[in-house]
From Swiss-Prot:
PROSITE patterns: ATPASE_ALPHA_BETA (PS00152)
Function: Produces ATP from ADP in the presence of a proton gradient across the membrane. The catalytic sites are hosted primarily by the beta subunits.
Gene3D superfamilies: 2.40.10.170, Bovine Mitochondrial F1-atpase, Atp Synthase Beta Chain, Chain D, domain 3, P-loop containing nucleotide triphosphate hydrolases
Family affiliation: Belongs to the ATPase alpha/beta chains family.
One term of GO molecular function: ATP binding
Name of protein: ATP synthase subunit beta
């Protein structure tokens, strides 16, 4: 480090996670410069220049014990994290420091967490499908390789379990590198995930970045750390998977420090820069002509309200949205994906083929008809329906149950072994139901099975 890099300043104000530091007027730190507290490893990141040599910073760690007058040194560069193969199989914090007690990360390359998004002419569109082995996703809202997917759901409907199953199915089949960013989620889940990856021997292909629930908001703002690692693999010409759980905590952390940074709150108390912050992040999660980033992001929906500014801002950036519904979860159907609310840009006969497209639309029409008839059934009962409507309702209830599926990651809790269903089998199964080839089977036969053949087997046992 040059001597110019070690300009010293003094803390003049501490309010929660926001710290004001005064420097000599002629050597004020730049926005996003990293400052280090003298005698400790605590890092502050410059957010605003207030003038007269004073900068406002966010503390990336606990601010316990800080007081006015402490010395802070300016590193004169943004926060940089290790990237490349040495990060694989390791757990890192927001600053790229290892937290798995397995020694330092010996990486030759570091990269600033603040990067520009790729230029428009570098982007690469993708129409190649990514099979997940989860029936409802492959049928209703298929993923594109190099696309962005959001898992939307309220508290306790299964976002993390769905995310884990996707990681289990895709990361193991994929064979490439993955980056997992745990942003403000439960430490227990992070620990479970680490051991699961270890047990299935894919840990050496995954880089883990954790900023958990108990950490100050500055840490959760840094979903950028994981993204920077994923971008590096992409720029090396690799196809990488990027998982984020949970993108809402990133927004929430911004909300927590926004008022302390002196900004006026906007709708529902969110930061006024919500759309810009989300845009900056999402535009970087993209595929270029060098390599692809396929990202799956869990998005918490406050009070199950999809029109809340945070999930609503995220919607526009995604290629596929998987909406988890409390009503479906209350029926005991897992994964609790709402087939009428979930969408994908891949649902196009030119992309997924005519057969897949028509089966998807027929399944949705049948379910929509059942939804419309539900009120009539509740008041007058099934007997008042026409024979066609009775048939539609019977098929819809079978479809609804056939959309459920036992998960590998939930095997410990449910006792039933997980099922991976290939796309061809999924299409064949739903085609048989909508064509009326399963009208003679009881609806219980379709609950928690994999392929349609298993439903026939189950029906024999029931009868």
């Amino acid at each position: 480090m040059s001597t110019a890099a070690l300009v010293e300043g003094k803390i003049v104000q501490c309010i929660g996670a926001v710290i004001d530091v005064e420097f000599p007027r002629d050597s004020m730190p730049k926005i996003y410069d990293a400052l280090i507290l003298d005698g400790s490893e605590l890092t502050l990141e410059v957010q605003q220049q207030l003038g007269d040599g004073v900068v406002r910073t966010i503390c990336l760690g606990a601010s316990d014990g800080l007081r006015r007058g402490l010395t802070v040194k300016n590193t004169s560069k943004p926060i940089s994290v290790p990237v490349g193969k040495p990060t694989l199989g390791r757990i890192m914090d927001v600053l790229g420091r290892p937290i798995d007690e397995a020694g330092p990360i010996e990486s030759e390359h570091t990269r600033s967490i603040h990067q520009k998004a790729p230029a428009f002419d570098e982007l690469s569109p993708s129409t190649e499908l990514l099979e997940t082995g989860i029936k409802v996703i492959d049928l209703i809202c298929p993923f594109a390789k190099g696309g962005k997917v959001g898992l939307f759901g309220g508290a306790g409907v299964g976002k993390t379990v769905n995310m884990m199953e996707l990681i289990n199915n895709i990361a193991k089949e994929h064979g490439g590198y993955s980056v997992f960013a745990g942003v403000g989620e439960r430490t227990r889940e992070g620990n479970d995930f680490y051991h699961e990856m270890k047990d299935s021997n894919v840990l050496d292909k995954v880089a883990l970045v954790y900023g958990q629930m108990n950490e100050p908001p500055g840490n959760r703002l840094r979903v950028l750390t994981g993204l920077t690692m994923a971008e590096h693999f992409r720029d090396e010409g690799l196809d990488v998977l990027f998982f984020v759980d949970n993108i809402y905590r990133f927004t929430l952390a911004g909300t927590e420090v926004s008022a302390l940074l002196g900004r006026m709150p906007s709708a529902v108390g969110y930061q006024p820069t919500l759309a810009e912050e989300m845009g900056k992040l999402q535009e970087r999660i993209t595929s270029t002509k060098k390599g692809s980033i396929t990202s799956v992001q869990a998005v918490y929906v406050p009070a199950d309200d999809l029109t809340d500014p945070s999930p609503a801002t995220t919607f526009g950036h995604l290629d596929a949205t998987v909406v988890l519904s409390r009503d479906i979860a209350s029926l005991g159907i897992y994964p609790a994906v709402d087939p009428l609310d979930s969408t994908s840009r891949q649902i196009d006969p030119n992309v997924i083929g005519e057969e897949h497209y028509s089966i998807t639309r027929r399944v949705q029409q049948t379910l929509q008809r059942y939804k419309e008839l539900r009120d009539i059934i509740a008041i007058l009962g099934m007997d008042e329906l026409s024979p066609e409507d009775k048939l539609s309702v019977a098929r819809a209830r079978k479809i609804q149950r056939f959309l459920s599926q036992p998960f590998h990651v939930a095997e410990v809790f449910t006792g039933s072994p997980g099922k991976y269903v290939p796309l061809k089998e999924t299409i064949r199964g739903f085609k048989m139901i909508v064509d009326g080839e399963c009208d003679h089977l009881p609806e219980q036969a379709f609950y928690m099975v994999g392929t349609i053949d298993e439903a026939f087997e189950k029906a024999k046992k029931i009868s």
